[in-house]
């Protein structure tokens, strides 16, 4: 089961993806798939995007390699309120829809030839996690704590 009960967010098991980030690093991006509810016209609560059993966590400076691809995808339509967002925010929530993830993944895959073996493994693991998460949702909320 990929989803926890909405009250069990403390049971999440973050997958920490590291390339060069030191173990003591605290600045990070968390990737939380949104659990879509059957209730129409309701705004998702914090619990709806903190109930995926194995969310992804990437620390600074490792997320810098990804942020450049996020920036290329903007402007996007924010999935939380359907307003246009001009830029990716490493300090706050970014509600990214499946179509935008597909663009981001494509742009990474086109560039894979330019990376070292370790960087390719990092990026391919990221792509695999996003692709798997998108089997269960159409929105992934990326939260930064910078």
List each language-model region with its residue ranges:
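Acidic (Asp/Glu-rich) sequence patches and key acidic residues
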Residues: 1-136, 145-146
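Conserved GNAT acetyl-CoA-binding A-motif
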Residues: 140
């Amino acid at each position: 089961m990929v989803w926890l009960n909405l009250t069990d967010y403390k049971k999440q098991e973050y997958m920490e993806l590291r390339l060069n980030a030191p173990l003591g690093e605290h600045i990070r991006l968390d990737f939380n798939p949104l659990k879509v509810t059957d209730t129409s016209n309701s705004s998702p609560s914090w619990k709806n995007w903190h109930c995926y059993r194995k969310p992804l966590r990437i620390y600074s400076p490792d997320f810098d390699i990804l942020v450049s691809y996020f920036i290329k995808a903007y402007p996007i339509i924010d999935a939380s309120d359907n307003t246009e967002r001009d830029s990716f925010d490493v300090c706050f929530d970014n509600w990214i829809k499946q179509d935008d993830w597909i663009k981001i993944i494509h742009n990474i895959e086109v560039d894979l030839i330019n990376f070292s073996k370790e960087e390719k493994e990092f990026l391919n693991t990221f792509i695999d996690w996003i692709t798997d998460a998108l089997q269960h949702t159409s929105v992934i909320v990326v939260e930064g704590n910078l």
